[in-house]
């Protein structure tokens, strides 16, 4: 948030206000700086009096890798370490209704994983350029790369989980978790965004969208013609996500 010029520093910094928070996740080969360098997220956050937290997660897929080096538990790190740390350091709200999560690509996958496994922590989630898939359809050599359990990246995740059956029954199987929670009303509000030229993701997202209709899960869909897996799309999508979250407060300074 940006201090309005009409307020003194003491009035602003000692107001006791607790701000809303967006937990914003990067994609593969990215880091905490991606969103600031490649979009206007700082301006969008300032306009809405929003605190944005952008952690670095390497290429972890936001998973716990207990056998990697000294152990790299990124799934637990966000909710068990980083969130309490930020709540203690910064003037932000820890209430569910004031916390949102979003991410792109690998970060979109992380977003839906955190949202459905910790539905008590987030009011809403925006999944950009990522799509849940039905793990029960996984098979070696599946023409759908996201369902090919022999794909090196997927295989590494399967082995990390302790085998295919363990992987299918883990927190990674967001499709199954959504099926379980959809009738309960406990899920955060969900948004999915994708460009029509982001071929693999878009096709899987269309399958998931049909499934949502079948199970009666109401989601917000942001689909843009002609866009691929690219930052121009994600800059547009995050603006739509902030509107979807209901962050309409106008704050800061217009110049």
How should these model regions be labeled?
Residues 1-255:
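Non-catalytic cap/lid and distal C-terminal segments of serine-dependent acyl enzymes
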């Amino acid at each position: 948030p940006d201090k309005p010029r009409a307020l003194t520093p003491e009035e602003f910094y000692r107001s006791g206000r607790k701000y809303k928070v967006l937990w914003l996740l990067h994609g593969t080969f990215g880091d905490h700086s991606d969103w600031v360098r490649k979009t206007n997220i700082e301006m969008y956050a300032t306009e809405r009096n929003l605190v944005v937290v952008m952690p670095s997660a390497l290429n972890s897929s936001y998973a716990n890798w207990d056998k990697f080096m000294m152990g790299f538990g990124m799934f637990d790190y966000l909710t068990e370490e980083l969130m309490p740390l930020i709540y203690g350091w910064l003037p932000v709200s820890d209430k569910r209704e004031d916390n949102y999560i979003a991410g792109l690509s690998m970060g979109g996958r992380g977003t839906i994983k955190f949202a459905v496994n910790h539905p008590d922590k987030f009011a809403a989630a925006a999944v950009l350029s990522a799509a849940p898939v039905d793990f029960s359809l996984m098979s070696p050599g599946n023409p759908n790369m996201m369902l090919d359990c022999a794909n090196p990246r997927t295989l590494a995740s399967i082995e990390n989980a302790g085998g295919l059956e363990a992987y299918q029954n883990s927190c990674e199987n967001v499709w199954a978790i959504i099926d379980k929670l959809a009738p309960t009303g406990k899920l955060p509000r969900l948004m999915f965004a994708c460009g029509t030229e982001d071929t693999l993701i878009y096709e899987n997202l269309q399958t998931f969208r049909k499934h949502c209709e079948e199970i009666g899960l109401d989601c917000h869909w942001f689909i843009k013609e002609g866009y691929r897996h690219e930052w121009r799309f994600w800059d547009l999508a995050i603006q739509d996500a902030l509107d979807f979250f209901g962050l309409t407060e106008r704050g800061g300074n217009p110049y």
